[in-house]
């Protein structure tokens, strides 16, 4: 990856600020604010003070407003791992497993995050490395000032991964959909939230488990100055989604054969979970803003609640 020389390290400034989230190769789920768009794989966080009133949720969105001088960009980068000898997806356990990869990355200053005694994520200077359900490796980058900083950050991450992966005889592939293996041949990571989602997804669509185990993406999170600015950016990002899907289409293979799609990943989202996917038409209606988006959020069924370090199944609860 080639980036401009002389770009200072910006990563000590902290993690994501509130901002718009725009994804490619095919986005379909587009929550506009980073508190709602934390990666599927992101470590869980618990608010110090419980939210008891709807107005508090609106205030969370409003509190993300920033002057343009303070705007930042946060990038999320996902990729599939595979064993170099047989091309199979690595399991979590084992000498060549995903946990071994995460442990190897700690030599670069990443701090391990554990769940039930297992390392399931890494943290460093406002960024994190996390796991999607089948072990897809995700960099959730720090909040940085420019695309050049994002380029440096992603390039550094990929170089670190390549060093450790090479020692484990692993490779990584950036594509929208797993090109070779069936769903039942994909491993599952030992994370509490994923077991809940694994049980729930077949109830709301036929392709949700494929979304979890066989897709990858790149996302960008953007800041906003005012409610009006948020609305404008949200509308523009949604309007550009079909173009982004076409430009970055990269999933033409399924189980080793052409699947007839340029973006099979886009097709996956058509039958995953209608309650939380698809185009959000109400964003283009007059009067859309923080209040209307909170109404939408409150109408989406929950997956789980997280209390005292334990995931509690709340799937389907409104």
Where are these regions (language model features)?
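Compositionally biased, low-complexity intrinsically disordered regions
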Residues: 2-4, 17-18, 24-25
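Intrinsic-disorder-associated, low-complexity terminal segments enriched in Asp/Asn/His/Tyr and depleted
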Residues: 9, 16, 26-28
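Terminal catalytic/cofactor-binding subdomain
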Residues: 3, 30-205, 214
């Amino acid at each position: 990856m080639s980036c401009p020389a002389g770009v200072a390290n910006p990563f000590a400034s902290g993690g994501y600020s509130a901002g718009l989230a725009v994804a490619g190769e095919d986005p379909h789920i587009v929550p506009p604010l980073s508190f709602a768009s934390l990666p599927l794989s992101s470590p869980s966080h618990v608010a110090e003070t419980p939210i008891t009133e709807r107005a508090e949720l609106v205030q969370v969105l409003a509190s993300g407003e920033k002057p343009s001088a303070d705007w930042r960009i946060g990038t999320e980068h996902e990729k599939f791992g595979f064993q170099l000898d047989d091309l199979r997806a690595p399991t979590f356990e084992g000498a060549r497993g995903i946990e071994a990869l995460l442990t190897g990355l700690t030599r670069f200053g990443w701090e391990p995050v554990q769940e039930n005694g297992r390392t399931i994520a890494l943290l460093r200077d406002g960024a994190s490395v996390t796991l999607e359900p089948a072990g897809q490796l995700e960099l959730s980058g720090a909040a940085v000032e420019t695309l050049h900083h994002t380029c440096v950050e992603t390039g550094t991450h990929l170089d670190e991964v390549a060093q450790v992966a090479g020692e484990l005889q692993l490779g990584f592939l950036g594509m929208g959909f797993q090109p070779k293996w069936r769903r039942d041949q994909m491993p599952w990571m030992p994370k509490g939230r994923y077991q809940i989602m694994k049980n729930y997804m077949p109830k709301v669509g036929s392709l949700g488990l494929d979304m979890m185990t066989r897709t990858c993406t790149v996302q960008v999170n953007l800041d906003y100055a005012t409610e009006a600015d948020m609305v404008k950016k949200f509308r523009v990002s949604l309007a550009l989604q079909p173009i982004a899907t076409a430009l970055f289409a990269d999933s033409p293979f399924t189980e080793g054969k052409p699947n007839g799609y340029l973006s099979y990943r886009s097709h996956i989202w058509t039958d995953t979970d209608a309650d939380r996917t698809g185009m959000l038409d109400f964003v283009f209606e007059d009067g859309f803003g923080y209040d209307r988006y909170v109404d939408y959020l409150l109408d989406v069924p929950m997956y789980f609640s997280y209390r005292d370090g334990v995931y509690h199944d709340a799937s389907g609860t409104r």
